[in-house]
Amino acid sequence: MSSSSSIKLQPWNDFIEWGRYSIPGSQNAITRMEDNLNFYSGNYIAIVAVVLLITLFTNMNLLVAILLLGAIGYYLFFVQKGDKNIGFAVLTPMIQMVILGVVSVIVIYKLSGLTLFYTTLVSLLFVLAHSALKMRNLKNKASNFVSGIKNDLKNELK
């Protein structure tokens, strides 16, 4: 069975449905997680984004720093593409990305302590726990199977 590559937001009442949770057997856990991560990917992205936005809006210094780092990244990688000559050194885009990443981690750590990292970690743990414990109903599995077949047919007809 092929999985759909598009990200769709599934209905929230189906996502939350309290009667559909159980602890999977060790053989079933990975399959259930893969299925749920594919099927509910839009919902998971929305949850992580909302939690991160709440964290950013409660810490204005961090929000300004993130926007500034994003603007610097945009300038480096989209406005002024290519190598940069700084004195005796040539900075390739990969080196620029590493430097920006290290500076970003340091700035975020200094401004938020570990709040942003903990927020991200808790969000991802929620996603993994939900994907492992949520049993999808037969209707959802059939819908996913049909969309996979449609995608396979589209790819073969191209």
Swiss-Prot record:
Naming one, the record's GO cellular component terms include: membrane
Q: How does it sit in the membrane?
A: Multi-pass membrane protein
Q: Where are the transmembrane segments?
A: 36-58, 62-79, 88-108, 113-133
Keyword field: Membrane, Transmembrane, Transmembrane helix
Q: Main site of residence?
A: membrane
Kindly list the places in or outside the cell where this protein is found, as annotated in its UniProt entry: Membrane
Origin superkingdom? Eukaryota
Keyword Transmembrane helix assigned to the entry: answer is yes
Known function: May act as a general Rab protein regulator.
Recorded family membership: Belongs to the PRA1 family.
Q: What is this protein called?
A: PRA1 family protein 2
Q: In which organism is this protein found?
A: Dictyostelium discoideum
Lineage of the organism = Eukaryota, Amoebozoa, Evosea, Eumycetozoa, Dictyostelia
